[in-house]
Amino acid sequence: MKVLILLVSLISVCFSQIAPKPIIVGGVYRGGETCNSLQPPYTCSSDDLAGGIMMRQGACTYFRGLSNLPTTYNSSSDGSSVIQYTYSADDYFCQESPIQTQTISNGDCEAGCSNDKISYLYNLSSDSNDQVPKNAVLTIKSQSSNCATDWETTWESIEYLNTDTCIVDEVTGGSFKVSCTQGGMTIYSYAAPGCTNNPKVYGVGFYTDSCDGYQVCSL
């Protein structure tokens, strides 16, 4: 009996060590409204989904629209919400005490402003499915030294930008959309919202110099 109990204990310990961390999935919706025009309750429409982020629980990351400061995300103990911990700007690895904590119910649509003119809408949810988004440009953060071949199993966070989706440019007030191949991405830049009329076209190679921001095209 003692041997059986010991065996079960060892199996439990091994499982806890190899079990993947929960995934926190965020969607960012960019409708282009002014910040002052938004009033709760907010609506995150799938038609406006520009991209988002996938995060391992506890990974230190930045993501425009959710936070411009170092941030970690954890699932609540009952799995009903996501807890966002924000750290000071110089706490690059989220090692000190957080300066702000926010609890977001799974699926709730939240608003955040990057400046006085453009707003972001986003929602967060806990998810055990780590399937990588398709038809998107991926920017990957990994602790691996060989992420060119193993990023799919070693990633800590993945920021993704959906291809062929019109996105409001928060800097210029215009709009843009992207397409991609394994060699890089093409950016179509428009002077006005709506992605219509005579875009300027730019070809951009992917960043592949390190595993902190490694880029690929997911088809």
Curated annotation (Swiss-Prot):
Residues 1-16 form the signal peptide. Its main location: secreted. Keywords: Glycoprotein, Secreted, Signal. GO terms for cellular component: extracellular region. It comes from Dictyostelium discoideum. The gene is cfaC. Glycans are attached at residues 74, 123. It is found in: Secreted. InterPro entries: CfaA/B/C (IPR021837). This is Counting factor-associated protein C.
